[in-house]
Amino acid sequence: VCTGRRAFTESLALDKAGVSTERGVVLTDGNFRTNVENIWAIGDCVGGMMLAHNAAAQGEYVADLIAGRHNGVNLKVVPSCIYTVPEIAAVGLTEQKATEAGYEVSVGKFPLGANGKSLIAGRERGFVKLVFDKKTQKLLGATLYCDRATDMIGELALALANGMGK
């Protein structure tokens, strides 16, 4: 069961500062600026992927913007995960999103039932799916639905961030 999360902003007195919210979520632009000058928001209070590693990447991004630097943090390669059994982890574009973005995609999907280690461990339920740009052969995204998916997604995020492919 996944129950989801919600932003907990009630105690921040955002209304007194004039910061716009919607259903408890702080509204920001593409660079985490709120509608009030010099007030930025990151992490769970802005909704989206509510995970510590995502908030840390957002914090690094915003700190550099405030300091007048552009650090090149690519928030599109920050993985997401769901701690279910089996786990779900993803990074980059799904097949559908890649197609909608105009890519001609090629997809590789590997069922865990065909993996010896998974069979021995009795954890053959699941798959690994990789989405590539058919023209350049570069990785566009990955989805893992398997035991320890959240432990393995980092390597695929690294490959995606570095423009690696087949």
Regions inferred by a protein language model and the residue ranges of each:
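FAD-site-proximal beta/loop scaffold in flavoenzymes
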Residues: 1-66
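Small-molecule pocket liners
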Residues: 24, 79-80, 128
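Proline- and acidic/polar-enriched loop/turn elements at helix boundaries
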Residues: 26, 78, 110-111
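Solvent-exposed alpha-helices and their adjacent loops that cap or buttress functional pockets
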Residues: 33-34, 38, 74-75, 120-122
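Short amphipathic alpha-helical segments
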Residues: 38, 78-79, 140
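A conserved FAD-binding loop/helix module that cradles the flavin
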Residues: 42-99
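Flexible, glycine-rich terminal cap/loop adjacent to redox cofactors
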Residues: 83-166
